[in-house]
């Protein structure tokens, strides 16, 4: 699967945002257990430095979460790659992302040619993410709303990626998962969280698996402009 996006000259990057630096990040991800080549190619291609403040650009290709304002973060690249790899295993076409944030996770999914729907409760973050999607020529459908509700009008989804942690998986989101689909989400409180994958079998039965310990911001209700 070849990543699809339009790269402007400033997207290519120089110095600490150069292709060489991105390649080193991909090798670190590979060494850390990410095996799916489509995921690794998308991580190599999508310019993470465009999804953070310019002052932090020199750290864009470190394998660490970084602040994006409003008490939110852009996720650690390994976590983005692991979540992407997990949902690609069910060969999805249509994906729901809960928590647009900077737009980086959604951009990775869109670069893989998936039909992406993303919901963000913080209006300012969503406006910035939309500009980035347009800049990269990505057709990502986005909505300013309470992410815990999902986007049922366009469901069911082959895959659902949740980028903030709740004490338990949210029933309203599980209800929007198609038969054969997979939901990946962090579950837990401030002191302990796990990345959980939930798969709905052909018979409708639900199977859960814990993938890794993680740390995410909390999944909150309501909306902010």
Curated annotation (Swiss-Prot):
This is Protein-L-isoaspartate O-methyltransferase. InterPro entries: PCMT, SAM-dependent_MTases_sf. The lineage of its organism: Bacteria, Pseudomonadati, Pseudomonadota, Gammaproteobacteria, Lysobacterales. Belongs to the methyltransferase superfamily. L-isoaspartyl/D-aspartyl protein methyltransferase family. GO terms for cellular component: cytoplasm. It is found in: Cytoplasm. Its EC number is 2.1.1.77. HAMAP family: PIMT (MF_00090). It catalyses: [protein]-L-isoaspartate + S-adenosyl-L-methionine = [protein]-L-isoaspartate alpha-methyl ester + S-adenosyl-L-homocysteine. One of its GO terms (biological process) is methylation. One of its GO terms (molecular function) is protein-L-isoaspartate (D-aspartate) O-methyltransferase activity. Catalyzes the methyl esterification of L-isoaspartyl residues in peptides and proteins that result from spontaneous decomposition of normal L-aspartyl and L-asparaginyl residues. It plays a role in the repair and/or degradation of damaged proteins. Keywords: Cytoplasm, Methyltransferase, S-adenosyl-L-methionine, Transferase. Its main location: cytoplasm. PROSITE patterns: PCMT. It comes from the Bacteria. The active site is at 75. It is an enzyme of class 2 (transferase). The keyword Cytoplasm applies.
């Amino acid at each position: 699967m070849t990543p699809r996006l339009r790269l402007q000259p400033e997207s290519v990057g120089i110095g600490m945002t150069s292709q060489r630096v991105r390649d080193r990040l991909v090798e670190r991800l590979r060494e850390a257990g990410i095996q799916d080549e489509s995921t690794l190619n998308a991580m190599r291609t999508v310019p993470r430095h465009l999804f953070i403040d310019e002052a932090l650009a020199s750290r864009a290709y470190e394998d660490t979460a970084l602040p994006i304002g409003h008490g939110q973060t852009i996720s650690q690249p390994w976590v983005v790659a692991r979540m992407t790899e997990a949902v690609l295993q069910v060969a999805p076409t249509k994906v729901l992302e809960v928590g647009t944030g900077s737009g980086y996770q959604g951009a990775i999914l869109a670069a893989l040619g998936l039909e992406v729907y993303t919901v963000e409760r913080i209006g300012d973050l969503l406006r910035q993410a939309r500009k980035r999607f347009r800049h990269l020529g990505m057709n990502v459908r986005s909505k300013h709303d309470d992410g815990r509700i999902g986007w049922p009008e366009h469901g069911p989804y082959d895959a659902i990626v949740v980028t903030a942690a709740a004490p338990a998986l949210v029933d309203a989101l599980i209800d929007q998962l198609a038969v054969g689909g997979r939901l990946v989400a962090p579950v837990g409180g401030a002191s302990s969280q796990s990345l959980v994958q939930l798969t709905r079998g052909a018979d409708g039965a639900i199977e859960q698996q814990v993938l890794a310990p993680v740390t995410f911001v909390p999944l909150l209700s309501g909306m902010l402009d």
